[in-house]
Amino acid sequence: MNDLPWLSLLMVVPLTGAAVVAVLPSSSAALARPIALGSALVTLVLGIIATATSFTRGSTEQFQMVEQHEWIPQLGVSYSLGVDGISLALILMALVLVPVCILAAWDDAPEGGAWHKGYFALLLVLLPFMIGVFAATDVFLFYVFFEAMLIPVYF
């Protein structure tokens, strides 16, 4: 299980949930909340499993769960992710806070309100970008994730 691309998987799950929430028809807008919460909780569970199976506590100063793929070789830019002790703590904090935010907004509007789909979809889009910011080991990739993170925050 240590060969799984855990960090990329943690980014794909909420993006998939966001896509499902975004394409819900207006008549099913009430499903946005449970789908968003389910997606966030699945991501949290995957984060806990990844930490338990792939992170060695004795070497928190080294990058672990490393994924590296060439992206723009002419510029020396790569899709490079990894976590150390601090970045893992920040990722786990984000994974806990997103379900809390979803639960906090659970009753803020009438059932099936028009803003539910957009709010929950954008919150789920924000999560993988936060994970990317905390896990990026390439400065260009960090910049891309940080700037991408600002888009759902703006709306």
Where in this protein do the model-derived segments appear?
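Membrane-embedded alpha-helical segments in integral membrane proteins
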Residues: G17-A22, E70-S78, L126-F140
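Transmembrane alpha-helical core residues of multi-pass small-molecule transporters
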Residues: V13, G17, S39-V42, L97, ...
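Hydrophobic core positions of alpha-helical segments in small-molecule transporters
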Residues: L9, V13, I35-G38, A121-L122, ...
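Transmembrane helix-loop-helix hairpins at membrane boundaries of multipass inner-membrane proteins
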Residues: M1-W6, V23-A121
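Short conserved micro-motifs on helix faces and helix-strand junctions that flank
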Residues: M11, L81-G82, L95, A135, ...
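N-terminal signal-anchor/start-transfer transmembrane helix
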Residues: L9-S27
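Alpha-helical transmembrane segments of multipass membrane proteins
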Residues: A18-V23, I48, P99-I102, P128-G132, ...
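Alpha-helical multi-pass transmembrane bundles of energy-transducing inner-membrane proteins
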Residues: S27-A29, G118-V125, F129-F155
